[in-house]
Amino acid sequence: MGIPPYHWWRTVFFLIPALTVYTIVCGAASILSSFFDRNGYFAHGCARAWSWLILKTTGVEVDVIGLDKLTPGTTYVFVANHSSHYDTPVVFTHLPFQVRIIAKQALAMFPVLGWHLKRGGHLFVDRKDPDRTGILKRWRALVSQGLSLIVYPEGTRTVDGHVARFKAGSFLLAIQAGLPIVPLSIVGNRAVMPKGRLRTEPAHVSLIVHDPIQPPVLVEPTVHDAKDLAERVHDIVAAPIEHALDVVHG
């Protein structure tokens, strides 16, 4: 028997209260652990538990394709499309790496979530005044600890499910840091909770891990170099998503 769809009442009276409890409990454990776990490893475990609970409670099933392309213990920059609030839970649950995200500064203001991100070693970027030198310094500090990064270079969730243009900033940082980039395609996640809709639906999602890309070795990389790399990665990420949209729309 299939899982019945979640109607608005189920979201409001069951899912939202459940997610609130998960966030408070896992967030509190994460924040407390940061006082004795400076690397944030336990905090990441809390984030993975939180993500797993969210997916299970919502009824999201995930197929992971291509995970064997990754080498355990390697530090990567994971680059993914962004169409739903559920993208991060999907990635956190199914990537067996210690990862940190580059998040917009506004998230730092959220109670519990913002505190967890700050104490857990995640990076914040002010879009209006990005301090790339400071970000690169903090990025390298994370890399020295063997931590990988997750980037959503569209900058925000897309409305129509298509993959928007990738901004070049994070790719310039990746070139400067010399880290391999792993394109990730999250297919079908928009059906769970698209931008602008509160109600959630169960869905079958695919997380496609593409071949790692080693950025060019450049003494002084330019924005043009970053844009070229961004376009290349964008096309890889977008291909299976656009194919899925074509199938849906006939």
Model-predicted segments: where are they?
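A secondary-structure boundary/capping signal
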Residues: 66, 80-82, 103-104, 152-154, ...
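Catalytic core of membrane glycerolipid acyltransferases/transacylases, capturing the structured
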Residues: 26-44, 48, 55-58, 72-129
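Non-catalytic C-terminal accessory region of glycerolipid acyltransferases
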Residues: 2, 134-250
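Structural motif corresponding to alpha-helix initiation and N-cap regions
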Residues: 64-67, 73, 110, 133-136
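Membrane-interfacial terminal anchoring regions of lipid-handling membrane enzymes
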Residues: 1-35, 41, 45, 68-71, ...
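Short gly/ser/thr-rich secondary-structure transition/capping motifs
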Residues: 58-65, 132-133, 189-192
